[in-house]
Amino acid sequence: MRVLITGTSSGIGKGIAEKFLKEGHNVTGIDRKDASIQHKNYTHICMDIRAKEQYPELEPFDIVINNAGVQNEEDIDVNLKGTIGITEKYGIRPGIRSVLMIGSASGHNGSGF
């Protein structure tokens, strides 16, 4: 399967990517930071998901996992608008099997900046 994951440079996103790679899938990761995964089946795109004009044309994916998130003054632009943008561009296509959204307790509780 072909899997797209946002927020793959560390944490949950990196762990998810490594799991799919271990199972033999092709993974494309998107993150503002440089790649932290080195694998023959991994492609890293260094970009900010808020910048829709930078979204590259990519081959269709079977699974899209929206994992990128921040907890600062940019949270609406990244956590909401960026997630919507990625889903519209890559998740709404014929043949898509799953679109997963990953969030945190901050989405329910919020916090001060």
Protein language model regions, located:
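Catalytic loop of short-chain dehydrogenase/reductase
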Residues: 98-113
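A short, exposed helix-loop element centered on a Lys and neighboring polar residues
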Residues: 87-88
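Conserved glycine-rich Rossmann-like NAD(P)H-binding loop of the short-chain dehydrogenase/reductase
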Residues: 23-37
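Conserved Rossmann-fold cofactor-binding substructure of NAD(P)-dependent oxidoreductases
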Residues: 46-60
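Conserved N-terminal Rossmann-fold NAD(P)-binding element of oxidoreductases
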Residues: 3-7
